[in-house]
Swiss-Prot record:
Organism of provenance: Pelodictyon phaeoclathratiforme (strain DSM 5477 / BU-1)
CDD domains cross-referenced by the UniProt entry: AAA (cd00009)
InterPro entries tied to this protein: AAA+_ATPase, AAA_lid_4, DNA_helicase_Holl-junc_RuvB, P-loop_NTPase, RuvB-like_N, RuvB_C, WH-like_DNA-bd_sf, WH_DNA-bd_sf
Function, in words: The RuvA-RuvB-RuvC complex processes Holliday junction (HJ) DNA during genetic recombination and DNA repair, while the RuvA-RuvB complex plays an important role in the rescue of blocked DNA replication forks via replication fork reversal (RFR). RuvA specifically binds to HJ cruciform DNA, conferring on it an open structure. The RuvB hexamer acts as an ATP-dependent pump, pulling dsDNA into and through the RuvAB complex. RuvB forms 2 homohexamers on either side of HJ DNA bound by 1 or 2 RuvA tetramers; 4 subunits per hexamer contact DNA at a time.
Protein localization: Cytoplasm
Catalytic activity: ATP + H2O = ADP + phosphate + H(+)
Record EC number: 3.6.4.-
Gene transcribed to yield this protein: ruvB
Name of the protein: Holliday junction branch migration complex subunit RuvB
C-alpha cells in the first residue's frame, strides 16, 4: 500500500510512534465490532465486483481510530491512500489537484471533513457521484466550464462533528459508520499490544489502571502508556508496574474517571461560577481560557458520556452528579441536606 501524507504533523516523533502502534489489518483492529464486521462485508463485495468501495463516513469523538480504519480500508482494498484534512483544502484547486491525481480504486482520506469550506465542498458532489469535476476557466463573458473525468475512487471522510456536515455531502456517503467509546477491557488489550511494540513490559494491574483512566479512548491509552514508559526508564525500570502507572497518572493529574485538569476546570467553572448553568459556549471558553472548538470536540463528549454535563438550547448545564462532585463544601452540604428532607 502506497501512502501519501499531505499534511505536516505537529509532532513528528509522536506521529512516528503512533504509526508503529497503528494496526494495518482489520483483524488487528480492536473494538467497534459491528462497524468492522459490516466493513468486511462491504470490502469483500467491492473486491468481488472489481469496483471501488462506496464512499465511507467515519464519525465519532477524537482518538477512537477513525484515521487508523481509513488506512486499514485502503490496505484491505489493496489500494493506495492519499491523506489530507478539511482545513488544508481551502481552495478548489487544491481539491481538484488531488482528485485528478487519483488512480483507479485509490482511497482519498479527508480528516476533519466538516471543516471544508462550502465552496470547495461543492466540487466533491459530482466527483463522488459521477467521478467528474467541473472547473470554470476565465471569468465574465469569456467564462466557460471544463469537465474533467476522474478515476473511480473511495472517499473516506472522518469527522468529530457530523452535525456540521451539510445534507448534500452527508447524503453522498454510501457507508456511514459511527465510533463508540471503548470498554476498559478492550483498552487493556490495546495497551498490552502497544507495550510489546514499544519494547517494554507491563503488568495486568498497571494496564488496568491506565485503561480505566483513558476516557474510553485508545489514543489516550497509548499516550499514557508512553508517558508511563518515560517514568519507568527515568526510574531505571524496564517494566511498568502498578506503582509506576499510578505515579504517572498522579503526576499528570488524571483522576480515577480519567478527568484531567481542564475537565475539572470546565466543570468547576459551570458549577461554581455560573451556578450550574446554563452557560453559553462562548462565555465558558473565555472563562476557562480554551478554544470553543476544543471544548466542543475534545472535552464535552466525554463529560456528557460520564454524566456530568448536558447540552440544552440555552447552553451547558451541570448534572446533579456534577453538582455533588464539583460544588464547594458548603454547597455540597446543602445538596445533601435537601436530599435528606422527607417528601410530603
Amino acid at each position: 500500500m502506497r501512502i501519501e501524507l499531505l499534511n505536516t504533523p505537529p509532532d513528528a516523533s509522536e506521529t512516528r510512534i503512533e504509526e508503529q502502534i497503528r494496526p494495518l489489518r482489520m483483524d488487528a483492529f480492536a473494538g467497534q465490532q459491528r462497524l468492522t464486521d459490516n466493513l468486511r462485508v462491504f470490502i469483500s463485495a467491492a473486491k468481488m465486483r472489481g469496483e471501488a468501495l462506496d464512499h465511507v463516513l467515519l464519525s465519532g469523538p477524537p482518538g477512537l481510530g477513525k484515521t487508523t480504519l481509513a488506512y486499514i480500508i485502503a490496505s484491505e482494498m489493496g489500494s493506495s491512500i492519499k491523506s489530507t484534512s478539511g482545513p488544508l483544502l481551502d481552495k478548489a484547486g487544491n481539491l481538484a489537484g488531488l482528485l485528478t491525481g487519483l488512480q483507479k480504486g485509490d482511497v482519498l482520506f479527508i480528516d476533519e471533513i466538516h471543516r471544508m469550506p462550502p465552496t470547495v465542498e461543492e466540487y466533491l458532489y459530482s466527483a463522488m457521484e459521477d467521478f467528474r469535476i467541473d472547473i470554470m476557466l476565465d471569468s465574465g463573458p469569456s467564462a466557460r466550464a471544463v469537465q474533467l473525468r476522474i478515476e473511480p475512487f473511495t472517499l473516506v471522510g472522518a469527522t468529530t462533528r457530523s452535525g456540521l456536515l451539510t445534507s448534500p455531502l452527508r447524503a453522498r456517503f454510501g457507508i456511514n459508520s459511527r465510533f463508540d467509546y471503548y470498554a476498559p477491557e478492550l483498552l487493556e488489550g490495546i495497551i498490552r499490544r502497544a507495550s510489546t511494540i514499544l519494547g517494554i513490559g507491563i503488568d495486568a494491574e498497571a494496564a488496568s489502571e491506565i485503561a480505566g483512566r483513558s476516557r474510553g479512548t485508545p489514543r489516550i491509552a497509548n499516550r499514557l502508556l508512553r508517558r508511563a514508559r518515560d517514568f519507568a526508564q527515568v526510574d531505571g525500570e524496564s517494566f511498568i508496574s502498578r506503582s509506576i502507572a499510578m505515579k504517572t497518572l498522579d503526576c499528570l493529574e488524571i483522576d480515577e474517571e480519567g478527568l484531567d485538569d481542564m475537565d475539572k476546570k470546565i466543570m468547576e467553572t459551570i458549577v461554581n461560577k455560573f451556578n450550574g448553568g446554563p452557560v453559553g459556549i462562548a462565555s465558558l471558553a473565555v472563562s476557562v481560557g480554551e478554544e470553543q472548538d476544543t471544548i466542543e470536540e475534545v472535552y464535552e463528549p466525554y463529560l456528557i458520556q460520564a454524566g456530568y454535563l448536558t447540552r440544552t438550547t440555552r447552553g451547558r448545564v451541570a448534572t446533579r452528579q456534577a453538582l455533588i462532585r464539583f460544588s464547594t463544601a458548603s454547597e455540597r452540604d446543602e445538596i445533601s441536606l435537601f436530599d435528606a428532607q422527607p417528601t410530603s
